[in-house]
A protein has these predicted regions:
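Extracytosolic and intramembrane catalytic regions of membrane-associated proteins
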Residues: 132
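Single, function-defining residue in the core of a domain
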Residues: 1-55, 60-63, 68, 72, ...
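Conserved beta-strand elements of the Class I
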Residues: 110-112
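Short Lys/Arg-enriched helix C-cap and helix-to-coil transition segments
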Residues: 87-101
Length: 436
């Protein structure tokens, strides 16, 4: 157990060394970049980017080198990282995760969740697709949108798509991640409202995956269906078409719950524009009560006998894990604090933070907290564990001590606690206002 953190660290360094054997695959000018001796060669640069937190670049370089040597200048770091392709850190993230990940199953299925989150960074008017000018005296700001695929049983990020906020399309990002996934086990993917497009459902089904998606009750896929009041679990089959002939309109009038005419602007890749065919879609619509005054409506292609409505309620509750992980990713790992305003550099930092999150989670999840006669069950304090794991990666903590240090930092699990979500505008912490 105490050697496990060292194994994870060695795996990360192994991936970086393998990439350093062929730096030309990950840089902008293969014939020039990383061909001369520098203070920040390819391998050292990647390691530094993963180790960094949210302080200034100067302080981060000093911390990562543990003050054992004079670091390269900030200008040198910026010049070296400009040579990297954005795909370099993405490859590191995915390869490291694949080498370390041991899938855990739920009833024979990998249980995944997809969600998106906005990431604010320094206003950059030179990037119009991410830039928002301030209105009513508000300062301008810039946003990227992170779409992430998350394993709910292993608590690891598996894939991510980064989009400029004005061009963000969560459904397109989900379809991209589903299409390129190499998962061999059966999969159940859960998602919140906004992912219930016909195109997305059919892409997931054709992949052989199962889906469980929360839908809007007032509009969307279920709005035209004849559904009962209260709780229910009903099978639904509808037919999609591009035709708008009188015969089709008559069918729509006679069976409004069965037929859908797709306008030309609606993307459904399995019915090209001008097609005269009908495309069948089948799924379950399930509604259940979650409190005295609120209900949830889900659509799924899971079998009713294997997954009754109570199981679906439990599955959807598990989806909250990705919401918690986003909070930890932003405010514990440091994804809300970037060291650049160029989208290419920020993309590097996002995948570096995702790699660090998985590194910390892999180590923390193997720490066993002994049960004692206490009022509450205790779990590891992830915030403290991240600090310990980051220092371990930087070489400031020896491997045998990592597990003991994490074991000593625990917090109680208090079931049944809930607080209304408070939304507020969070200002970006500029480069000149970082703690020393």
């Amino acid at each position: 157990m105490k050697n496990y953190p060292k194994r994870i660290k060695n795996t990360l360094h192994s991936v970086i060394r393998d990439m350093a054997k062929h730096p030309e695959d990950f840089c902008r000018c293969p014939e020039k970049n990383f061909t001369r001796n520098r203070k920040l060669p390819f391998e050292k640069l990647l390691t530094l980017l993963v180790k960094m937190g949210g302080h200034s670049l100067r302080d981060e370089m000093l911390d990562c080198l543990a003050f054992k040597e004079t670091p390269a200048s900030v200008s040198a770091l910026v010049q070296q990282r400009s040579k990297l392709l954005p795909e370099a850190l993405e490859y590191l993230f995915q390869e490291f995760t694949n080498r370390c990940h041991s899938p855990k199953l739920y009833k024979g299925y990998r249980l995944l969740a997809v969600d998106g989150s906005d990431l604010q960074f320094t206003a950059n008017p030179n990037d119009p697709l991410s830039y928002f000018p301030g209105v009513n005296g508000q300062k301008p700001y810039s946003f990227l949108h992170l779409n992430a695929l998350y394993d709910l049983n292993s608590n690891l990020y598996l894939d991510a798509v980064i989009q400029r906020r004005r061009a963000a399309n969560e459904n397109a990002a989900l379809i991209s991640m589903v299409g390129r996934s190499e998962i061999h086990e059966p999969v159940i993917i859960t998602a919140d409202r906004g992912y219930e497009s016909y195109n997305t459902l059919e892409h997931i089904s054709r992949k052989g995956w199962k889906y469980l998606i929360r839908v809007r009750e007032s509009r969307g896929i279920t709005s035209a269906l004849s559904l009962p009041e209260g709780d229910f679990d009903v099978p639904v089959q509808i037919f999609l078409t591009r035709k708008q002939t009188n015969a089709v309109k008559a069918l729509m009038k006679k069976h409004p719950e069965k037929y859908r005419i797709l306008p030309g602007h609606v993307n459904f890749e399995f019915l090209p524009e001008g097609s005269s065919e009908f495309y069948p879609l089948s799924f379950r619509v399930v509604r259940f009560q979650i409190s005295d005054d609120s209900t949830e409506t889900l659509i799924t292609n899971l079998d009713k006998d294997s997954f009754p409505s109570d199981d679906l309620k439990h599955l959807y509750h598990l989806r909250w894990g990705i919401e918690t992980s986003f909070r930890q990713l932003k405010y514990t790992i440091g994804l809300s604090l970037f060291q650049s305003k160029k989208v290419e550099y920020i993309t590097q930092e996002i995948f570096a933070r995702l790699t660090m999150y998985n590194f910390c989670e892999l180590i923390t999840s193997h720490v066993v907290i002994q049960k004692k006669c206490r009022k509450y069950v205790y779990q590891t304090n992830f915030t403290a564990a991240v600090h310990i794991c980051r220092q371990f990666l930087r070489g400031s903590v020896a491997p045998p001590k990592v597990v003991d240090l994490i074991k000593a930092q625990v917090v109680p699990i208090r079931p049944g606690r809930s607080t209304p979500r408070r939304t507020k505008n969070i200002k970006f912490n500029g480069f000149f206002y970082r703690i020393a």
